[in-house]
Structure formats: C-alpha cells, structure tokens
Curated annotation (Swiss-Prot):
Phylogenetic lineage: Eukaryota, Metazoa, Chordata, Craniata, Vertebrata
UniProt cross-references to SMART domains, sorted A to Z: KRAB, ZnF_C2H2
Top-rank taxon: Eukaryota
Keyword hit for GTP-binding: no
Residue ranges covered by zinc fingers (C2H2-type): 161-183, 189-211, 217-239, 245-267, 273-295, 301-323, 329-351, 357-379, 385-407, 413-435
UniProt source species: Homo sapiens
Localization (cell): Nucleus
Keywords: DNA-binding, Metal-binding, Nucleus, Repeat, Repressor, Transcription, Transcription regulation, Zinc, Zinc-finger
Name of the protein described by the UniProt record: Zinc finger protein 140
Its biological purpose: May be involved in transcriptional regulation as a repressor.
Family: Belongs to the krueppel C2H2-type zinc-finger protein family.
GO CC aspect terms: nucleus
Principal localisation: nucleus
Primary gene name: ZNF140
KRAB domain residues: 6-77
Amino acid sequence: MSQGSVTFRDVAIDFSQEEWKWLQPAQRDLYRCVMLENYGHLVSLGLSISKPDVVSLLEQGKEPWLGKREVKRDLFSVSESSGEIKDFSPKNVIYDDSSQYLIMERILSQGPVYSSFKGGWKCKDHTEMLQENQGCIRKVTVSHQEALAQHMNISTVERPYGCHECGKTFGRRFSLVLHQRTHTGEKPYACKECGKTFSQISNLVKHQMIHTGKKPHECKDCNKTFSYLSFLIEHQRTHTGEKPYECTECGKAFSRASNLTRHQRIHIGKKQYICRKCGKAFSSGSELIRHQITHTGEKPYECIECGKAFRRFSHLTRHQSIHTTKTPYECNECRKAFRCHSFLIKHQRIHAGEKLYECDECGKVFTWHASLIQHTKSHTGEKPYACAECDKAFSRSFSLILHQRTHTGEKPYVCKVCNKSFSWSSNLAKHQRTHTLDNPYEYENSFNYHSFLTEHQ
C-alpha cells in the first residue's frame, strides 16, 4: 500500500454519545491521544488531507461524538435473577489499556480480561448489528466465568477481513494490510534522513523524532517536553497523583497501565522470561533485556555530545543534562533549580533542618563534610594522591590503593571454591559465576562452599 492511499478514515474511529458515556476517564484520554497522534502522523508525511471535524473537537477539548447519529443499542443490559448475578456493564470489565489498539479496535476487539468475575453472569439473548460495519455485540445467557469470557472474545466484534496466511481476522481492512506485512516483510515507509524503513506510519514518525528532536507537548507544571501527547498525559499524573489503573486482586492503583500489567504478574506468579546465562527469571521481556546487559557489559545508549555510553536510557537522559543549562527542578523555598529531581529532594532536606553539605558548583548535597571535600575535587581537578612508582595521580586515596596493586601484584580477593585470587572484588564476583553457572549443584554441595557459608554466617 502506498502512502498516498492511506486516509484518515483508515485509522480513525467514531463513538456515539451513548458509547462515550461508558468510557472511563483514562480510556477517554487514550482515545484523544490516539486520534490526534494518528492525524499528526498523516500530516507529517505530507499527505493532502483536510482536518476532520472530530479532530477539531478533540483539539478544543470537546466531546468527540459526531452529529446526531442515533444508535439504537442496549449495551450490555442485564436481566436480574436469583443467585450470584451481578450487574454487567463496561465499568465491570478490566481492559488491557497497555495497547493503543484498545481504542483503534473499538474497545472490545482485543477481548476484555475477565479477571474480576467471581460468580455467574446472565445477559439477555439479543443480537444487533452496529452501523457502518463497526462491529457486532451479541448477548447470550451464560452461567460461568470462562464461558462468558470465551463467548465475548469470539463474538463481540465483527471481523470480516481474514489473513490467508495464518487465518487471523480483523475488523478493518487497514488492520489486515498492516498485519500482512508481518508475513511479507514489506516496509513501505522510508526515513528521508537515514533511509531506514518501517512497516507502519506511526513507527516512522516516532523514528523521525530522533533526527528532529521535536517535542511539541509541554507540561505546564514543570516545563518538561514530550514527543507524544500520551507521554505528556502519563507524566502529568506525577503532579496530580492520579492513579486510574487499579488491581482487582489487592486494590493497589497505578498511574500507568503497563505498571498494572507488570504488578498483576505478582498474583499469578508468572515469570516466563528466563536468562540463559544465570537462570534468573523475570516478569517482562524488558526486565530480562536490562538484566542481560549485566552479563555482556553492553552500553547501547551513547551521548552524542561526549561519546560516553550507558546501559540504560534513563542514565543517558540524566547525563545529558550536564551538557545543557536546563534546570527544570526548582525548590519552592529558595527558588534554586537543579538538573535532577534527586538533587532537589536532597537539597530540600536542608530546609527541613537536616545538617547537610551542599556543593556551591553544582548544588549536589552530601551528608558528610568529608564527602563534600572529596566531591569538590571533581570540579577543581585536584589529584593529591600520587603513585610513588609511576607518578600517576588520583583524587581519592582509595583509587591510589587500587592502582598500586598493579605494581605490587597484590591479589587480596580469593575465591573460596578454587582458591584463585584477584586484585579487584568485581573480578572475583565475575569469576564466582563460572562456578554457579557451570555446575550449581556441585558448587552448593562442595566443602569449600559450606566452609565459606559457615565463615560468612
């Protein structure tokens, strides 16, 4: 599919006023984000399209339903009966808000998660087709949680577009086209800057932010900017304290749907991502990837200013503030500003009456005066500790002691399993993994291991 053949109707969705009232605030925010961003994606690619009415309404903060279109549907109506029959409406359903396809497939198309259903559920036998090929909601009588979940997953939305490769069906032709690219490998959207290609418009637009650095959405509370409106909305919850995503098991609430999803794995004990190096299990793939870097030593995030590399993107972001004069975190007491939020928190302890020592150069705060003196050397470049062997100088005495081992050959760190010695504790820690990884059971049952354990205890 060429870029010119994509229209806003392919990636848009309409809600009636009746449907809109069932959506929770977080779902309405998600809808606004997706609609405005998808329109922005098409415009940024130079497609000649006029601004739809629904986009204008959303930009003005108005309700998005269009015209006076009447939709005669009795959504999720329930017949009361004896026994444990509960009210059944969208507010009882826990949706997986972690994906934007929640809105793009009309809320129900991904299948709701019925984790909160405890008793029987009874719905009226009735079927009505929605207008404009937008779906089908079928109501049947069911008496068990699994039966209802299975029925709703199959029947809630009409999916007339089927993939010939795998049989998967979709409610929209455009969704089928996007899916088929997973089989063909087609990537029709190319970046004009670097030539990298993508299968979806949204991925291209996200990638182009790397080249432009454009972050048009600004937080009014702290002036922090974001590439996407959805990121700004999530960030604003750090100021308001809003936590719209609640765990049905324990009642704990979260500001992000992804955090709720991660938390819910605690209740089911699901850790399907296992590290092949050490066997440690993780609840999410991102946690596994972050962990694996500790084995490889890889530092994929590089600062374009000085070339310094980092294991985590958050560490790179924190480092980059060194190169800029931007200090977004301001103290309400004295109006002093800081690069990092953690620096502001430490600084505020001074106003609380704690005796802390603050660096005049960068504002960093220390609990001990000696730590401040040591830190100031990083600004002055002073290195008072010199090696008598090679005249190499260091800012810390401990760094000199470590360096001198390269001359003396001292190796104070000894492995309790094989008696191999090392100059650095970090090298010993790395070495000890070879015992636990190669044969963990033999290591745990060995005499040296138990003597080491006894000594440690």
